[in-house]
Regions:
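Regulatory cytosolic signal-relay segments
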Residues: 388-445
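Hydrophobic ligand-binding cavity/cleft-lining segments
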Residues: 13-65
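Cys/His-rich short segments
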Residues: 244-315
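Catalytic NTP-binding/metal-coordinating core of nucleotidyl cyclase/transferase enzymes
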Residues: 434, 438-518
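N-terminal accessory interaction module
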Residues: 307-412
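Catalytic beta-strand-to-alpha-helix segment of the class III nucleotidyl cyclase homology domain
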Residues: 501-622
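Beta-strand/loop substructures that line and gate deep hydrophobic ligand-binding cavities in soluble
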Residues: 101-154
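A conserved amphipathic terminal alpha-helix motif
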Residues: 13, 133-177
Length: 634
């Protein structure tokens, strides 16, 4: 991908007062690390700008109707000058090159273009080339521009060498930054309390260390799964500990609204009640509906009484912010750009600013070249096939410059979505007042709903009496709640003798159902009058809506209706669920079940019948009480 406005040597610009030459500075260095290893660090432009420029920036949305590829106007200081500029979206090809063009509105420059190219070398290393082009407003400013350009490029070279040493020799990170002091007394208190609550010791140490000595940039948006992933810890345990930490005044919980395309946060609120049914991403120029499992993410920040952190922005557009985007480029109005297809065979998405999309199937047997045309809010064709590293030419037939990007669809996200968080028992216990706006049901694209029902309760109440029966029913709720929590789900509510629970993944829901049957069999052995009861379970997965009902988070929709109907198809000791889900189970999971029957049932409002399996535990459990009675009789 070429660098915008790039050329060889110097370029001339005619001004009303003088002839001004642009200043071009380049530097090439050799690195021992491979381009793919250097890329995630060298493209962290927020941190590199922090080190090289040293002054933060203020980002404001560009004026509506501006015929520009830029989405923001930036105000900052550099080299002793105040300046503002329109920042075009960064352009890049993964692991190969990136660049950015800034059209200056004020300050000593007309324009600023910066780019980095990473080329693999025969020894497995990288040839890194840095190129900076500065266009002064007046010829007298050219020497200053040259001086500043040399300084910036030299500093970037040193940062790249530090990155290389960090990767190759485990040298300190080049991004070590000064930190504000933490309140050690509050930290020690919170650590002791977290230990008392039985939370994972490694997770507790990681949280305390991060709050004590982590840079502000890492603390203004603490993402539990990302923190855990980087330290080899369990993500749910990290999330669980941070929820506990909120109750101890160690951190505060925030909800970030995340764009479904660039996946960056464009707004942040402190309560679920502040979330509406729609948000807008300025960068992607995209309005989108709020879905709890895609567009709302839980993040944390140290409580101000523990540590004061500042949210300074030095750059918001570098490739590091959107690792799922493999190519991004600006296509001027009425022109075309040729993009390189990804090297890995998979399905990708072509996205154009404003929301037009097309699918890209990268496969060895696909054509070498393909074309796409952008008209209004549509990309045609909607289905594109390309071989790895093939050429895709995109034509912009609109009246304004737009950026396009190729996105990985299967990129694993490290977001602790609101759907994940609200299914956790800790959230329901500690944050029962953090509810959605009553008039705003929010969609969840995929959720597995489990219903259980206690059987034999009529005989139980008759024989044991109301008090003993009520106690047994309540105790069985505790048993199921513990198992559901351990399996990654959350109890939504109890209704009479029944439990309703929600899970993120359908297979996890099946595993929880199996574990519930095992746990209940032990409960029948241990509990007085337990032998009078049984349990049956049904589950179903699909889209649903999350609402606030009876001052609690609840679920409704056809998926919930289907799950309830499926549970009614079960007999005592059975788990009933979809046939397709049964076939997706691993051999290990299937071995835990015995298939009783394949059945079909209809649900009102669902066009086709549900194809279900009735299953039992693979090994029938004989209660200890039955064994004792058999021994006594003999």
């Amino acid at each position: 991908m070429g660098t915008r406005g790039s050329g060889h040597g110097e370029r001339e610009y005619s001004g009303t007062l003088s002839l001004v030459r642009s200043v071009v500075v380049t530097k090439t260095i050799q690195l021992a690390s491979a381009p793919a290893d250097v890329w995630p660090l060298i493209t962290d432009t927020d941190r590199t700008n922090r080190l090289v420029i040293g002054t933060s920036s203020v980002y404001k949305p560009i004026e509506p109707g501006a015929k520009s590829s830029a989405r923001f106007v930036v105000e900052t200081r550099a080299g002793g000058f105040s300046m503002s500029y329109e920042e075009a979206p960064f352009e890049w090809t993964l692991n190969k090159s990136f660049s950015v063009y800034r059209k200056m509105r004020s300050g000593p420059l007309r324009a600023y273009t910066y780019g980095v190219t990473l080329a693999p070398t025969s020894d497995g290393g990288t040839r890194a080339t840095f190129r900076l082009e500065l266009e002064p407003r007046h010829w007298a400013l050219a020497p200053i521009a040259k001086l500043q350009g040399n300084r910036i490029v030299a500093n970037m070279g040193r940062i790249a060498e530090s990155i290389d040493a960090h990767l190759r020799d485990s040298a300190p990170s080049p991004f070590i930054e000064p930190t504000t002091p933490a309140n050690e007394e509050r930290l020690d208190f919170a650590k002791r309390e977290l230990v008392k609550r039985g939370l994972d010791g490694g997770v507790i140490d990681a949280i305390v260390t991060m709050i004590r000595s982590g840079p502000d940039a890492d603390l203004v948006r603490m993402r539990p799964f990302e923190i855990a992933h980087g330290r080899g810890l369990d993500g749910r345990e990290m999330l669980r500990a941070l929820l506990h930490a909120v109750t101890l005044g160690l951190v505060e919980l925030r909800w970030a609204l995340v764009c479904p395309s660039c996946r960056t946060a464009n707004d942040q609120v402190s309560s679920l009640a502040e979330i509406g049914d729609e948000s807008h991403c300025q960068l992607c120029d995209l309005s989108y509906g709020i879905e709890l499992d895609r567009a709302v993410e839980a993040t944390f920040v140290p409580h101000p009484s523990v540590r004061q952190v500042t949210n300074q922005m030095f750059c918001i557009g570098g490739p590091w912010r959107t690792p799922h985007v493999v190519v991004q480029a600006i296509v001027e109005d009425g022109s075309s750009r040729t993009l390189e297809a990804p090297s890995e065979q998979a399905r990708y998405r072509l996205f154009a600013r404003g929301g037009a999309v097309a699918s890209i199937d990268v496969a060895d047997d696909a054509p070498e070249e393909a074309n796409a045309r952008l008209t209004g809010t549509e990309l045609t064709p909607r289905e594109i096939r390309l071989r790895p590293c093939g050429k895709l030419t995109v034509t912009n037939a609109t009246a304004e410059p737009l950026h396009v990007k190729i996105e990985r669809l299967g990129y694993a996200t490290l977001a602790a979505t609101a759907h994940v968080v609200t299914t956790m028992s800790e959230f329901r216990r500690f944050f029962s007042k953090d509810l959605l706006k009553p008039s705003t049901p929010l969609k969840v694209a995929s959720c597995a709903i489990l219903f259980s029902d206690l059987t034999g309760s009529t005989a139980l109440y008759t024989k044991a009496g109301d008090a003993a029966a009520f106690r047994l029913v309540d105790d069985h709720f505790d048993v199921l709640r513990k198992v559901i929590d351990e399996q990654g789900g959350g109890v939504v509510k109890t209704m009479g003798d029944a439990v309703m629970a929600a899970f993120i993944e359908p297979i996890a829901c099946v595993r929880a159902a199996i574990a519930c049957l095992h746990a209940f069999e032990q409960f029948r052995i241990d509990a007085e009058n337990g032998e009078l009861t049984g349990i049956k379970i049904g589950l179903y997965a699909g889209p649903c809506y999350v609402i606030t009902a009876n001052e609690a988070i609840d679920y409704f929709g056809q998926t919930v209706n289907c799950a309830s109907r499926v549970q009614h198809c079960a007999d005592t000791g059975e788990i009933v669920f979809e046939e397709d889900l049964f076939e997706r189970l691993s051999a290990e999971d299937k071995a835990k079940l015995r298939l009783v029957e394949r059945v079909e049932t209809r649900v009102k409002g669902v066009e086709h019948p549900l194809r279900l399996v009735r299953t039992k535990l693979a090994t029938d459990v004989i209660s200890a009480r039955s064994l004792e009675r058999s021994r006594a009789a003999s």
